[in-house]
Each structure stands twice: as C-alpha cells, then as structure tokens.
C-alpha cells in the first residue's frame, strides 16, 4: 500500500464513487492530484527533479456538436508536461470529456483551445493537444517498443508485493547502452484498486542491470496501488538509486480505460517517445 493512500488531496475525488454523467460542457468536472503527493516521499521536489518528461494521453471517445448540431468525432493526443504542479485524475477527465457530447463548438480549433485552456489550468502546467480525424489514424500501424524483452526468462515467482530491494546489487561491472522491455507491468489504481496493465521500456547507459533482478522488481508492482504516472516515476527513481546509470529513460504505455490511455515517460536525456499504440492498446 502506498504511504499516501489516505492523503487529504484524494478525499474529494469522484474516483471510486457513484457519479452522474453530464453531457453539457462543465469544466468543474476536472480534478487535479498534486504531483508532490508521491514525489516528496521519494525525496523529489520541483527544484531537484532528476528527470523531465510528460504524460501522453490518447482520447478515443471525444465527440461534440458542430454549429448545425451534427455530431463530430475525433481522436485526441494530449501531452502534459511532467513539471506541472498536478496530474489530472483520469475518471474526472473522462467525465469532463463526456460533457462535450451535447455541446456546440463552432469548429475543431475551438475544441482544441478549450481543452488546452482547461487542462493547463487544472494541471497548472504546459499542455499540448492534437486532434485527429479518424481517416488520419486509419493506416497507423501497431507499434512495438524497441529493445530486448525480459519476459521469456524462466523464473520462479512467489511474491507479488512491491519491493525495490530486488534492485539491490543489480548493477554489474560491464558498462552498456541498451533498451529493455517488459509487457508484465501490472499495478492497481490508488483509489479503486482496479488493475492497470502496461508495457514498459527502460533505456539506459551505465553499469549493466541484471535482467532477472529487473524483471522481479517490475513484477513486484503487481499488488502495488499507485497511479500510472507515479509508478513510472518510482521505477525511474529506484533504478537511479540502486543502479546509478549515467542516462535513463522510462516509458510506459498502459491499456485504455473509459476511452483513455495514459502513457507516461521520464528521462534525463534527449529521449523522444514513440506515440503509436501498442498491441494491447
């Protein structure tokens, strides 16, 4: 269980509570969660963050009415800077997007501008937004994380409780530059404990990380309760602490829920994330 499970910032969230669905625009549905809530226990503060990055959201259920009342549909891609004060709680984001359904917007740019203004204000940070017509996405291939997959190791696993100590002594003597991938990342929502399924890519330069230890560490998230963004920052922080690579990038892409997927990345180098959806997305 996360040490901040009962943090006061979580008390007013609609997440985990019965909720009425509104189909007319209502910005008050958006709810923020302070990033400091999980960062401070890790010793991370705005003036000493060891990474930069973003939370990339894909919006699959976005619709509104044009000026003639004709429904419009789009796929949205949103990138929220990791140095924003808050992350955006996903259920509230879903409810907020639902409020567009019977709302008239004069054009697509009005929708994009509204999203940008509202999300920036909620997160207190920089947000970039792209809206795609469906025919722009039709030929987008299923992407795949580049790197060597950890998942075929023949391991006996008997513990699924989070334990960063799996990384103790995991840094070897040889120095390498490599990318490692696992599709076995599974954690649980901090509030509802619903499962969150993801794939993670870890790219680094430095002492070679023991692959068995790294996979055991990632599997130990299986009963861990934390938001997607927080899990990625925890992985980054633990690898830096135990393995001390010179460069590190951690990028996770999670399966969608409620028409949204969340894909956080954190890096201390010039990492550029792919944005194509993976097989399970």
From Swiss-Prot:
Summarizing the function annotation, the protein's role is:
Catalyzes the NADPH-dependent reduction of 7-cyano-7-deazaguanine (preQ0) to 7-aminomethyl-7-deazaguanine (preQ1).
Q: How does it assemble?
A: Homodimer.
What is the name of this protein?
NADPH-dependent 7-cyano-7-deazaguanine reductase
Pfam families membership: QueF, QueF_N
What PANTHER family would the database entry show? NADPH-DEPENDENT 7-CYANO-7-DEAZAGUANINE REDUCTASE
Q: Where does substrate bind?
A: 88-90, 228-229
Annotated EC: 1.7.1.13
């Amino acid at each position: 269980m996360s040490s901040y499970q009962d943090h006061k910032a979580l008390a007013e969230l609609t997440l985990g509570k019965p909720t009425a669905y509104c189909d007319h625009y209502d910005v008050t549905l958006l709810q923020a969660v302070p990033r400091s809530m999980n960062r401070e226990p890790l010793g991370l503060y705005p003036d000493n963050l060891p990474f930069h990055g973003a939370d990339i959201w894909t919006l699959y259920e976005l619709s509104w009415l044009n000026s003639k009342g004709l429904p419009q549909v789009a796929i949205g891609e949103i990138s929220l800077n990791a140095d924003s004060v808050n992350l955006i709680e996903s259920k509230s984001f879903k409810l907020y997007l639902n409020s567009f359904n019977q709302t008239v917007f004069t054009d697509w740019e009005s929708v994009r501008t509204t999203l940008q203004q509202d999300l920036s204000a909620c997160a207190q940070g920089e947000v970039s937004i792209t809206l795609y017509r469906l025919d722009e996405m039709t030929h987008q291939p299923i992407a795949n994380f580049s790197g060597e997959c950890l998942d075929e190791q023949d391991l006996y696993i008997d513990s699924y409780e989070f334990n960063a100590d799996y990384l103790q002594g995991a840094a070897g003597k040889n120095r390498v530059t490599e990318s490692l991938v696992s599709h076995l990342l599974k954690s649980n929502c901090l509030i509802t404990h619903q499962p969150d399924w993801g794939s993670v890519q870890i790219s680094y330069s430095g002492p070679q990380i023991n692959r068995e230890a790294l996979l055991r560490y990632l599997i130990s998230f299986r009963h861990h309760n934390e938001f997607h963004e927080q899990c990625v920052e925890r992985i980054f922080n633990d690898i830096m602490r135990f393995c001390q690579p010179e460069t590190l990038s951690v990028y996770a892409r999670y399966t969608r829920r409620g028409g949204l997927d969340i894909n956080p990345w954190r890096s201390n180098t010039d990492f550029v994330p792919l944005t194509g959806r993976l097989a399970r997305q």
